[in-house]
Amino acid sequence: PTRRGARPRCSRPRTAVPAGAVGIAGEFSAVYPRVSPGGWQLLGTTNTPMWDSNANPPALVQPGDRVRYRSVDKLPELVDHSARSKRAPARLPRMEVIDAGLLTLYQDLGRPGVGDLGVTPSGAADRAAAATANVAVGNPRGATVLENIGGIKLHALTDTVICVTGATARVRLGEMPVHLARPVLVTAGHTVSVDPATVGMRNYVAIRGGIIAESELGSAATDVLSGLGPDPVTTGDVIGVLPRSTGMTDAQLANPLRVSESSDGKTRATLRCVLGPRDDWFGDNVSAFLDTEWT
């Protein structure tokens, strides 16, 4: 039997639902904390803040809480208490972004362990490549890197050491070719260019010292869907790093390739898939999805 108040989802999801929208779908109800796609039936809006990354806990509503929606003619005025002074770590300007390419994000190992808040781990899409870039320049494996799609061009403001890993792409220091997964000294005034990838999609740029970016829920990873983390990198941004680095550089690393090119010129890759969190919603035809070779 259908519970009272239950409504089916929209046959066509909306591409953008406004923040604060109150929606129901099936036996569930929710408030959209940020602008995001969604296919729930919308009842109205609320200005009650549902999320504050600086609060403990960040989510206003916790499992087991009872929530009542009340119709009002006018939303009350609220005082924003979410702003808190945050002391940014010391940073040294190292590189200026001359061209950010199609998309460049700050990424690290993400936000594991907060799935109960509805927050996905996010982080670098190719963690092996990100870790390799960091180790090559003497950073901790999980230090923040730049994750780039479509090429990037950087101008050194001071002498620094960088490493590029990931997809197969041409990397140049000025006009000199540079190998992937090799630490490279870039002197002040010189530029590093990474062309769009020819095999694969994402390249990773690590800078010795570790890139500094705004942290949210313990991570500087940019999650473009939820809006968590720093904004995407844009042309003109200045990339800063920690003032000290004690690790040794490593020029003996291999670039980890997630995608390989076969003799017929096609690329092949194996994608890891985890069903869930509501894997009980899948029917028997899920096996067709898992067993199909996609092209």
Task: Describe the function of each predicted region.
Residues 1-295:
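Conserved "landmark" site that anchors the functional core of diverse proteins
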